[in-house]
Amino acid sequence: MTTQTDELLYDVKDKIATLTLNRPDKMNAFTGPMIDRWAWALNEAQHDPDVNVVVVTGSGKAFCAGGDVARMATGEPTALDGKNGLWEGIHRVPKTLEQMDKPVIAMINGVAVGAGMGMSVMCDMRIAADTARFSTGYVRVGLVPGDGDTYFLPRLVGTAKALELLWTADFIEAPKALELLWTADFIEAPDALRLGIVQRVVPDAELRDATYAFARQIADGPQIPIRMIKRLVYQSMKLDLRTHLDLVSSHMAIVRQSDDHKEGVAAFKEKRAPKFQGR
């Protein structure tokens, strides 16, 4: 199944939903209609029983350049309009992602700048082409990160490295130390891997095959524990150990009654590949 607007393509195949940002002439910079479609597509994928994994990528040579700087020049009528524009606009994407228990993978095919980098780090995993480059970007145009970088980056790379990324906004060719959120330096893919911003870096020509091979591995797995694992990992960041272990014991009791658990045990005993059904 494929549905699309001019600015975002949505396709479902083999239990994998692909969201493709589609403004290649503008490096896939956001627009209002694109964000509307993005929020819709995430909700659609979450509630579609034929979707087990979501992949987000960009068309052309960029992943996403973030907000359209040319449009920023027009400004907002009031500060309140600007705040509400974020909350009711682009913030729908991280708020929707927070509620999704299906795995979401960013397939980073090129430059990811500003909110484009932010949108990549709020996905569960990131697989990047070896030519991909990253920058928080905001400080270069006198802004604070607007889509959640200050929330997600510290959880990925730690406070000091997050500040370095967000302070500098320059390209980084080699490891640096303390200023990331203040400088908006660009980071090459190998450094992004070293910092923990991405989990895998592959040659440009292999990016699509590598991403979908990983996505299919997850999509073919037992979906009940896969989604419970995602919930447990994210909830663990907000809970004390005893509360977390209480949740773990409850989830374990549930999955041990599932057909997929029984199939997994049977397949192990019979030395064959399991055939999970998601129940």
PLM regions with names:
Residues 1-6, 266-279:
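Terminal low-complexity tails and localization/encapsulation signals of metabolic enzymes
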Residues 1-59, 95, 175:
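Conserved CoA-thioester-binding segment of acyl-CoA-metabolizing enzymes
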Residues 7, 58-96, 112, 140-142, ...:
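Glycine- (often His-adjacent) and acidic-residue-rich active-site loop
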Residues 24, 127-132, 188-189, 198-246, ...:
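C-terminal long alpha-helix characteristic of the crotonase
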Residues 90-100, 106-107, 113-167, 194-195, ...:
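CoA-thioester-processing core
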Residues 168-183, 187:
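Thr-biased low-complexity repeat/linker tracts and other Thr-enriched repetitive architectures
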